[in-house]
Amino acid sequence: MNVRAFSTMSPEDLRDVRALFLRQAAAETAHDIEVMDSILARPPAGQPDPVNFVARAYTFWGREAVLDHFRAVFAGTWQFEPDEDAMRVIPLGPDTAHLYAPTRITAGAAGQPAATFQFLVNEIAIRTADGWRISAIVPVPTK
């Protein structure tokens, strides 16, 4: 048994992961690609890119592919509204956390009517040399 895998995170770490996600939510609604770039993990030199976005309709592997996806959706209507009271940060180890947030997303292509959908957003945050960063984004539609 790997005892380290069951180590708890500090209350400060839990707050930092939560704050990172809320920063992401604000950046998405503001269509701020620079902040989105800052919250995604960067691989250490010589290591594989840990960033991915896996949805029912599509997948994106790597930071640049994920950022390109957000650049595309930011061209239209995009609002990202997590239910902060229902958010959960679940430690998976001292340097990894699962973040869960029921979220309302309003989306629409530029010049087209937008629609609102409910998702159960699941993300993995990892501790990096630069602090906590997002490595995986998995939005699960509720319907």
Regions found by a protein language model. Name each.
Residues M1-N2, Q118-K143:
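Short beta-strand edge/turn micro-motifs at domain boundaries
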Residues M1-P43:
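Short, low-complexity N-terminal intrinsically disordered segments enriched in polar/charged residues
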Residues L14-R15, I33-G93, F117:
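A solvent-exposed, acidic/Ser-Thr-rich amphipathic alpha-helical stretch
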Residues T77, I105-A115:
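Short, cysteine-centered beta-strand-loop-beta hairpins and adjacent loop/turn segments enriched
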Residues P82-E84, Y100-P102, A115-V121:
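Short, surface-exposed coil-to-beta transition loops
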Residues V89-A97, Q112, A125-G131:
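A short, structured loop/turn motif at beta-sheet edges
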Residues D95-I105:
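A short hydrophobic beta-strand element
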